[in-house]
Amino acid sequence: MTMEPRVLRREEWDSWYGSLIRAFGGVPEPAEELELFRELTRVDRSIGVWERDGEAEACVGTTGSFDFRMTVPGGAQVRAAGVTMVSVAATHRRRGVLTSMMRRQLDDVRAWGEPLAVLTASEPAIYGRFGYGAATFSLSAEIDTSRVRLSVPAGTDDVRLRYAAPADVLDACEAVYARLVPGRPGMLARRPGWERLALLDPESGRDGASPLQCVVARRGGEVTGFARFRVRPAWGPEGAGGTVVLDDLAGLDPATEAALWRFLYDVDLTSRLAVRGRPVDEAWQYQVSDIRRCRPESRDALYVRLVDVGAALAARTYQAPVDVVFEVEDAFCPWNAGRWRLSGDAKGASCERTSDGADLALSVRELGAAYLGGVRLSSLGAAGRVREVRAGALAEASVGFGSDVAPWLPHGF
């Protein structure tokens, strides 16, 4: 028997995707979702590991990637491979299947000239050895809207809200999203077709809640924001106690955002607002009367891997002037290993090979974690994951790598 990693062929998609679904528990996806991902999957960027036994073949490993552009500090949108659909059959664990796929995939990403690879991890412990570092975090909350009050900024009352069928206002909502992308690191410039993810609404995924609802915000005649949500009714001895389940919210200005949040707090017959996957620096946290009754929690979200260290570090800007030499360790992508001089500021940067002595020593995993500005190099240094060679270099680089806006991945892939 032989195992062969190779690029997926269109006629193999059903077998390949079936292997993926089985690895994630085997629960069939709703037909609408299945067909959308069939359309979105880039077959030429997808890999399967196939075991051949005589004339028979079976798929025992899957991975793929989407060709994204991701915002980085400074506002540039950098090419990034969105790694997805990673699985290994339970019958073939610890046989090198995952390593062979990651090897082929990162070689391909390099050949395509994409300086970054990014992913969301079902099991975070897996991906560090391949050079991925946790670069963004997301905020969840369970807000007791019967007890928590919201203090809103000036102009909030000028915002007009209207219900709309989600499909009818999809283009307007997508236009709002597109305007927000350059302003926050980690956001993805969506290709055509991706906006349809927001409309997926199978009954099996509602957990007792209503079909998807949408409210659109207008200010001065312009659509300035939207909220997509569901309502899960509940009744007890004291009356109604339903939950608003937020799916997505976006606003072009603070007043629009506040108006949308205030609306969600005030939905009739509800006393709770469930929030998932929001930016960790979102303003509502500082507008509430009692943050403890919001039960905020943070968790890891996007993992970043620098495939081309020089191109990736030169593609972003830096909050403060930085001139440091990194000694980079990268056993899995050895073309990155060695010394790199990064010189940059708020206007731009360069990153080139150098023979000069190192100022900081770290692995490519730490560079990935710090890349979007959400994880401080100084924190990684305190954890023993960055070694300072030149005194003061760690503080200099840590300040430079920072971002005023927390990086955020708005949706999975």
UniProtKB/Swiss-Prot annotation:
* Segments forming domain N-acetyltransferase: 3-155
Query: InterPro entries per the record?
Result: Acetyltransf_17, Acetyltransferase_Eis, Acyl_CoA_acyltransferase, Eis_dom, GNAT_dom, NAcTrfase_Eis, SCP2_sterol-bd_dom_sf
Any one of the GO BP annotations: aminoglycoside antibiotic catabolic process
- Has UniProt tagged this entry with the keyword Metal-binding? no
Q: Which Pfam families match?
A: Acetyltransf_17, Acetyltransf_9, SCP2_2
UniProt superkingdom: Bacteria
- Enumerate the active-site residues: 127, 413
Q: What is the protein name for this chain?
A: Uncharacterized N-acetyltransferase SCO2625
Q: Which organism is it from?
A: Streptomyces coelicolor (strain ATCC BAA-471 / A3(2) / M145)
